[in-house]
Amino acid sequence: GPEFSIDGHSYRLQDDGKGHIAHGGKPGFQNRVWDVMQADRQKIVLQYVSPNGENGFPGELTVTLTYTLTDRNSVDVDFKAETTKPTVLNLTNHSFFNISGDLSRTVLSQNLWIDSNRIAEYDKGKNVAGKLLGVRNTPFDFTKPHQIGKRIDSDDAQLAVTGGYDHSFLLRHPGDMRNPAAILYDAQSGRTLTV
């Protein structure tokens, strides 16, 4: 099962039944109730304290997550973490936004463009398989904008593994702030989200 060693001490982590641990275990941070430390019109600060040994990880870990609406009409996301013992940590953000403003609508009618011509292949256990797949002529081809739902029900092995779009897209211009990574547009609301 999943394990790691730090300073000569081995830690066995919660096994997902497939010999791995995903998202820090179950329940993961996404299933925890976070405390609201600050909330106003422009910012919300959330905090979660993971107790020592939770899902097998050493150290009490305090994670602070800040979402800020900036004067540049953007959303900044900032993570901070402090631990009482050496541990492993790889925080990420899986937030998603329905820019329609209508929570009864799904995102499937929204148009998406992604600056990517390759994705990471996943094996049947939803693990990165170590191979990059071209997106051309596949449901993952968002090099020309189209509705998210247009191809989501296609007969595609990679869609079947994850039950939809839950893949890593390899960007053509990574880290280049002059080129967007993705653009999402909702025709009904007129809103655009640029990442």
Task: Tell what function each PLM region has.
Residues 1-194:
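An exposed, glycine/acidic-rich loop-and-rim segment of catalytic or binding clefts
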